[in-house]
Structure formats: structure tokens, C-alpha cells
Amino acid sequence: MDQDMGMATGYFQDADMQMDEPAAATQSIYPHSATLFAAISACVFVTIGVLGNLITLLALLKSPTIREHATTAFVISLSISDLLFCSFSLPLTAVRFFQESWTFGTTLCKIFPVIFYGNVAVSLLSMVGITLNRYILIACHSRYSQIYKPKFITLQLLFVWAVSFLLLLPPILGIWGEMGLDEATFSCTILKKEGRSIKKTLFVIGFLLPCLVIIVSYSCIYITVLHQKKKIRNHDNFQIAAAKGSSSSGGGSYMTTTCTRKAREDNRLTVMMVTIFLCFLVCFLPLMLANVVDDERNTSYPWLHIIASVMAWASSVINPIIYAASNRNYRVAYYKIFALLKFWGEPLSPMPSRNYHQSKNSKELSGVIRSTPLFHAVQKNSINQMCQTYSV
């Protein structure tokens, strides 16, 4: 009996030692101050990111002016991706950095990198879609309305989301690498399987190649814009000369003003999209390089990996700020949502000016004239022809 109890005691002691061994092996490679900084940053980004992207989605869906642009569909896709990241990936990330371990089980550990890397691909491919939209608007203006019909936009968005997650099928199925827990960094990521990992290939196909497409496209846009500006200057000089020799230049002046306003609006939208891409690049490039170049030697610079990760998380938070800072239409949409939510009073209805009542009558008469079918037919035909010159 005593011998049996001794054997049982020895068995449980051996089991305890075996259970203690992984704990020693999974000791964090990061300083506690670094993990605390990462956890607090993740919590801050969760709060700002969820609110910011939710308000952005509401603002875009409720703004008829913004919904007129085909670009808006890709911006909505980008916002959904950021919202998914802030509401799913970042809360789990905050907990794992606070606890310095992964405590959510094996299944969720395999899902986590799929959502993380899939979101990165969706964001980048959505930007590619925006870039191609801007390029076609300028380079193939006559075919733009045919290419960006609602059904084609839907197909493009389905393609963006499908490709983003299909790229991850090899590690999901364990064919080329596998999804799992890196115990040294308590991170659920793409691990090597049989000495092979798909990380570098994903970096080239899912990050580097889309970035090159965006850079080349915006370079072509810039060159085209320079040529278009020269055309606009020549056209304006012609309009001025025609106005001096004719008293009937009012219609041309109206169309010139309308097209110039549309061109400036498209310009501002393009600049905003370039800003979003540059910020995304600045935020994500350090993490991508750290994961690819320093993948097996990440104990050398632990703080570098933490800072690179925090910068990558910031990319899902800054887009609403860029929208509000760089585009008036987006600011107006945000104001309306805030007013609807009673954050503050309606700021978009200025007091009538001194000449308001005088101008009101003339505007009503102008409105009656412009509401006639003949005016619309002539205006649409003329403006579509002239605006090709002003599509910048």
C-alpha cells in the first residue's frame, strides 16, 4: 500500500514538473513595460477606432452627396475592415499583452491571424480599388460611368474580400505553414511547418505588389493632372477671349464654373485617398519588415516589434481623422451625424444674410427655369462634353 502511494506521489510530482516546463518555456521575451504600453495602446485604439469607424459608416450611408461617388463603396469597405479589426482583433490583443499569454484556446488562436492578416489585405486592396477608380476617372473618363455601375462595384468589392482571405488558405489548411501560437511572443500568427512559412510570399503578393500598383497609378494620375491643368488654362483663356467678343457667354461661364467645381472636388478626394495610403504605408511597413526580416531573431529588438505593432494598430484609427481633416463633404456628413446624435446643435444652417430675401426670389425663378426638361437635356449634354477637359 505504501509502495502504491509512493508511486502515485511520484507520478503526480512528475506531472507537476511537466506542467511547469511549458510555463518556463513561454516566458515573455518582452519587458513588462513594453507589454503594458502595448496593452494600454490597444485599449485606447479600441475605444477611438470603434466609435470613429461606426460614425464614419453612419455618415457615409446617410450622405447622398458622398454616396454619388463610386469611391465611397471602397471607403465603406475600408471602414468595415477597420471596424472589424478594432472590435475583434484589438480587444484580444489588449488582453494577451496584459496577461502576457494567450488564454483564449486553440480554435480562437487559429481564427485570430486569419482576421488580422485578412483585414490588412482588405484594407490594401480597397485602396487599390480606390486608386484604380481615380485613375479611370482621369485616363478613361468617357468609359467611367460604364465601368462603375452599381453591379460592377459590388463585384469588385466581392473580389477584394474573397482574394484577401483566399490568400490565407495554404496556412489555414496546413499546406504551407500553419496558424498557431508563438509561445515566445504569446502571439497567434502564421508559423513554420516543416521548415516552411508563407509569410514572405504573402508580403510580396498581399502587401508589396498592391503598394507598387498604387504608387504607379498615382504617379500616372499626377502626370495626367499636369497635362489637364495645361488644357484647363488654355480653355480658360479661350473662354475669356470669347466672352470679350460675345454677350452670350453666360451658359459657357456657368458650365466652366460647374466643371471647375467638380474638378476641384475630385482633386480633394484624390488627395485624401493619397493621404490615406501614405499613412497606411507608414503605419504598416515597419511591422511587415519586422515580421519578414527579423522573424527568427525578434528577441534582439523587443521594443522595436512592440512599437511596430502599435503603429500598425493605429492605421485602423486614423482614417476617420483624415476624412474629417481633408474633405469638406465628409466634415459636413460628420456634423450631421453628431447633430442627429445630439452631441451638439445643428451647425450647418447659417443665419440669412442681409440680401437673403432679395436673392431668394431670383433663385426661385432660376430654379423654375432649371427644372424644365429642355434645360436638363441641354445642360447634361453640354456639361458632359466640357467636363472631360476638367476631370482632374
Curated annotation (Swiss-Prot):
Annotated function: Essential for the first active step of germ cell migration: transepithelial migration of germ cells through the posterior midgut (PMG) epithelium.
Gene: Tre1
GO molecular function annotation: G protein-coupled receptor activity
Family indicated by similarity: Belongs to the G-protein coupled receptor 1 family.
Any one Pfam family match given in the protein's UniProt record, by short name: 7tm_1
Modified residues (Phosphothreonine): T372
Residues on Extracellular side: 1-39, 95-110, 178-202, 290-302
GO terms (BP aspect): ectopic germ cell programmed cell death; G protein-coupled receptor signaling pathway; germ cell development; germ cell migration
Additional observations: Overexpression of the Tre1 gene restores the taste sensitivity to trehalose in a Tre1 mutant. This experiment cannot be explained given that other authors demonstrate that trehalose sensitivity maps to the adjacent gene, Gr5a.
Source organism: Drosophila melanogaster
Residue list for modification Phosphoserine: S359, S362, S366
SMART domains reported in the protein's UniProt record: 7TM_GPCR_Srsx (SM01381)
Cytoplasmic topological segments: 61-73, 132-156, 224-268, 324-392
PANTHER family for this protein: B2 BRADYKININ RECEPTOR/ANGIOTENSIN II RECEPTOR, PROTEIN TRAPPED IN ENDODERM-1
PROSITE patterns: G_PROTEIN_RECEP_F1_1, G_PROTEIN_RECEP_F1_2
Gene Ontology cellular-component terms listed: cell cortex; membrane; plasma membrane
Consequences of knocking out this gene: Most germ cells do not exit the posterior midgut (PMG) and remain clumped together within the midgut pocket. The few germ cells that do leave the midgut early migrate normally to the gonad.
Keywords: Cell membrane, G-protein coupled receptor, Glycoprotein, Membrane, Phosphoprotein, Receptor, Transducer, Transmembrane, Transmembrane helix
CDD domains: 7tmA_GPR84-like
Localization of this protein: Cell membrane
Tissue expression summary: In embryos, expression is seen at highest levels in the cuprophilic cells and at lower levels in the amnioserosa, developing CNS, cardiac mesoderm primordium and midline glia.
Domain of life: Eukaryota
Transmembrane segments: 40-60, 74-94, 111-131, 157-177, 203-223, 269-289, 303-323
Positions annotated with a glycan in the UniProt record: N298
Broad class of the protein's primary localization: membrane
Protein name: Protein trapped in endoderm-1
Bilayer topology term: Multi-pass membrane protein
